[in-house]
Structures are given as structure tokens and as C-alpha cells.
Design a protein with these regions (language model features):
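Secondary-structure transition motif
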Residues: 2-239
Length: 239
């Protein structure tokens, strides 16, 4: 009996060590690109999942017969570019910044290139997401407002911050109906057509199919290729 009690105490001590380790693990932040409709869906609470194509070393491991998707998704392996439970994602989206353009020499391309000088914060302004912007040409001396692509958004401009609540790796076509709805899809009339008559997939998955292909088919990762994807679950926590 004493040995059993000692075993339980040892197990409890190990559990405490794990909790202390997890509690001490620093929270990391990662940028993630969303288009405007998906950003709006996340802010409204209609989007709580996103799927992204698995690339690089992670994909190489998936091609090994003895390495499962569960292994690739484990925190200990550190493959996820989107973090793990408790980490944060800040959404990069199209935005409007205040600044000017100047030319800088690119040694890589061996020529001058236009470079945007972001002056939004230093001039006491805030980044915008709506409204008109002047149709100015690059090279103007005076700064003004410019619509900027999502890839160039700085962390300071982010208005949507998400906390990761789950990460896994799966085939794209394994998505369930609830997961498709959690992707924030918009179900239209043609997605409903034929469903009651036995259409193969539910409307939410058909809507997700269309959304996915609109973003990824031209890149060679369409629905029909059924790529490995990171399935990331999250909740909105602020900006």
C-alpha cells in the first residue's frame, strides 16, 4: 500500500512539473494573412478555424511512412508556423497607412526600387481600414494616405488578435460540416441545390470548397489535390 501511495505521489509531482513547465512557456505571436471577408468573420465571431497548406520540413516528415500527422502536429516537434495552444496570431490584412515613397538601391536587383516610408505612428495618426485614399502617384514629396497590401502590415496596425486553441494536421477533404461552418463560410443558394436529393457534400463543405479554390487553386493546391493542411482553431481576444 505504501508503494502505491508513493507511486501516486511521484505521479502527482510529475504532473505538477508539467504544469509548471507549461505555465512558464512564453507565449509567442505569429502573423497570419486574412482577406477582408475572413478578417471580418473572425472579428464577428463567425470564424474560429483556418486551414493552411503544410509546406517545407513538415511536409517532408509527412511523406515518411512511420511519421503520422499527429506527430507532426505535436508541440514538442515545433513544426507549426502558427504556434500551439495559448499562442497568439495577429491578423495581417489590407490597411491604409500614412507615409511617402522614396527610392532605395537594391543590391540584389542592382537597381533603384520604390520603398514606402510608413509615417503613421510618428505623425500621431492611426492606421485605417476603410475610407477613400488619394489617387497619388509614387514619388510625391508630401506624405499622404496609401492603401497597403496585407503582407506589409506591421504588428502595430493589427486590429485582430487571436488565441490559438488547437492545432492539428489533416487532409483538406477530411473537413467536417461543423469545421466548415467554423471557417466562416457564406452559404449561397447554389450550395444548397440538390442537397435534399442526396448531393454528396453538405452545403457548408461545398461553400468551403469554393472558398478554398478561390484562394489556392491557382497556386496548385486546389480542393481536388487534397493537400495536407494545418487546421488551426482560435478565439478572438483583442487587438
Amino acid at each position: 500500500m505504501e508503494a502505491v501511495d508513493q507511486h501516486r505521489r511521484d505521479g502527482a509531482a510529475r504532473d505538477d512539473d508539467v504544469r509548471r513547465y507549461e505555465g512558464a512557456r512564453p507565449v509567442t505571436e505569429h502573423p497570419i494573412l486574412f482577406n477582408e471577408p475572413m478578417s471580418a468573420a473572425a472579428r464577428a465571431g463567425r470564424k474560429s478555424q483556418t486551414r493552411r497548406v503544410v509546406r517545407g520540413e513538415s511536409l517532408n516528415w509527412l511523406n515518411l511512412a512511420n511519421f503520422t500527422p499527429e506527430c507532426v502536429a505535436q508541440r514538442e516537434n515545433g513544426f507549426s508556423p502558427y504556434g500551439y495552444d495559448g499562442d497568439r496570431l495577429w491578423v495581417r490584412e489590407t490597411h491604409i497607412a500614412y507615409g511617402r515613397w522614396e527610392t532605395r538601391y537594391s543590391a540584389k536587383k542592382e537597381r533603384d526600387e520604390w520603398h514606402f516610408v510608413d509615417m503613421t505612428l510618428e505623425t500621431g495618426r492611426e492606421y485605417r481600414f476603410d475610407g477613400e485614399v488619394p489617387n497619388a502617384a509614387r514619388g510625391g514629396v508630401l506624405p499622404t494616405w496609401w492603401r497597403r497590401p496585407s503582407i506589409f502590415m506591421p504588428r502595430a496596425a493589427a486590429r485582430t488578435l487571436l488565441e490559438v486553441t488547437g492545432v492539428r494536421v489533416e487532409r483538406l477533404q477530411n473537413i467536417s460540416e461543423p469545421d466548415a461552418r467554423a471557417e466562416g463560410v457564406t452559404i449561397e443558394g447554389h450550395h444548397m441545390r440538390g442537397y435534399c436529393a442526396g448531393a454528396y457534400r453538405p452545403p457548408s463543405i461545398r461553400a468551403f470548397h469554393d472558398l478554398w479554390d478561390s484562394l489556392n487553386a491557382a497556386r496548385g493546391h486546389g480542393w481536388d489535390t487534397d493537400p495536407w493542411v494545418w487546421a488551426v482553431e482560435f478565439r478572438r481576444i483583442g487587438s
